[in-house]
Curated annotation (Swiss-Prot):
Gene3D superfamilies named among the record's database cross-references: 3.30.160.20, 3.30.230.10
Protein name stated in the entry: Small ribosomal subunit protein uS5
Pfam families in alphabetical order: Ribosomal_S5, Ribosomal_S5_C
Subunit structure, interactors included: Part of the 30S ribosomal subunit. Contacts proteins S4 and S8.
A GO MF term: rRNA binding
């Protein structure tokens, strides 16, 4: 016989929170040397996004790989940013910096696809950007590339944002 709470449980299970997807970028084994030997842990880097202009990344460390991934996903959901888009691309060219890693992101014509490699491609895919060109300059470790890309995406402004800034600057001059 069915329990009265079964239907509620099923609906909660089927409904994902805002349809947020995650993709694993890297897993690193971390070793700490202690008096008794070596302590092994795992670090995971995950990118999360909803393919509708929201994307984030997170890192997690734990004794087991699945737990590290879970922690990284939770951290990524807390760190999501809104990415402005124009159709299927970004509004303008932008440079992202983090440490010695630099990422140049350029808008591309519709239908040209994502010309990017590794972590940048995953970020663009989960952000819902399907036409963009990128170039990685300097450090190319996955975490530096991710942080530089997120820095670049956070610098993007829409045409309306720029017009508001110009109007406010003009009113300050008067």
């Amino acid at each position: 016989m069915a329990n009265r709470n079964d239907s509620r449980r099923d609906s909660r299970k089927d409904r994902k929170k805002d349809d947020i997807e995650d993709q694993l970028v890297a897993i690193n084994r971390i070793t700490k040397v202690v008096k008794g030997g070596r302590r092994m842990r795992f670090a995971a880097v995950v990118i999360v996004g909803d393919r509708k202009g929201h994307v984030g990344f997170g890192t997690g460390k734990a004794q087991e790989v699945p737990e590290a991934i879970r922690k990284a996903v939770e951290a990524g959901k807390k760190r999501m940013i809104k990415v402005p888009t124009v159709g299927t691309t970004i509004p303008h060219e932008v440079m992202g910096h983090y440490g010695s890693g630099n990422i140049m992101l350029k808008p591309a014509e519709a239908g040209s696809g994502v010309a990017a490699g590794g972590a940048v491609r995953i970020i663009m895919d989960l952000a819902g950007i399907s036409d963009v060109t990128s170039k990685s300059l300097g450090s190319n470790t996955p975490i530096n590339v991710i942080r530089a890309t997120m820095d670049g995406l956070s610098k993007l402004k829409t045409r309306e944002d720029v017009l508001k800034l110009r109007e406010s600057a003009k009113s300050l001059e008067d």
